[in-house]
Each structure stands twice: as structure tokens, then as C-alpha cells.
Amino acid sequence: MSARRPPRATPTPCPCGLGAEYDACCGRYHRGDAVPPNAEALMRSRYTAYVMGNMDWVRQTWHPSTCPADLLPDTATRWLGLSVKAHSQQDDTHAEVEFVARYKVGGRAWRLHERSRFVREPRAAGEPPVWLYVDGDMIGEAS
């Protein structure tokens, strides 16, 4: 008689769109096992946090000078996909990421097309610098 093996857990694909498993992709940033190496990786991890309702990560990676005080999960939004259009680094501490995020609210489909600005600086004195989201400009109309 052979012993039964427990069923294998199905890997969860990462919502960020890179095609990797969540635990090996954005999950490592969310758990604190790694730090996003560039603004694009941070932006993808923030999108994934929105998909998963991880508002702690969204707040932690938002520059304190622009982070809203009333940041709450939006349970009415269903995120459908992310497409990164461009990533440009101006210098060691400034970068921009242009992306399109698709989502649905109340059965209606929308597209968020944004050019986001990021800075790389320590969160606190004596800590190593990390990428932080500052703000973004909408490109075209939301549709």
C-alpha cells in the first residue's frame, strides 16, 4: 500500500503581469524579503497590492509628503490587468513609469493611463534609500 501525498498547492500567478508566481515576484516585496530594485518593480508591486487589498504596502511605498490620510481599500474595484508602457530613470533618485491599468467598477470597464513619478530616498534617517511613489499625471481621459 502506498502512502498518499498531500495535494500540491497551485502556484498563484502574480497580478503584476510579469508571468511569475506571486511568492517569487511581488510577494517577496510585500513580505519584506526584498526591496524593489527600481521604480518599475515598485509600481508593479503597488498594482499587485491594490489587487490584493494590501493597503499597508501601498501606504508604506507612498512618499509621506503626498500620501492621503484616508487611504482605504476599494472593494468595489476589480482590477483586470496591467501594462507598463515606459520606465525612465532621470538620475539615481528620480524615475517615471507610464502604465495602463484596466479595471471594472459596477460592471463597467475602465482604463487608468498614468505617468507616475518616483523618488529614491531613505524612509527614516540612517536607513538605506528605497523607491517611493510621489504622484502621477493622467494621460488622456479615463475610459
From Swiss-Prot:
Known InterPro entries for this protein?
NTF2-like_dom_sf, SEC_C_motif, UPF0225, YchJ-like_M
Q: Which SUPFAM superfamilies match?
A: NTF2-like
Q: Name one Pfam family in it.
A: SEC-C
Tell me which family the UniProt entry assigns to this protein: Belongs to the UPF0225 family.
Q: What is this protein called?
A: UPF0225 protein Reut_A0143
Q: Which organism is it from?
A: Cupriavidus pinatubonensis (strain JMP 134 / LMG 1197) (Cupriavidus necator (strain JMP 134))
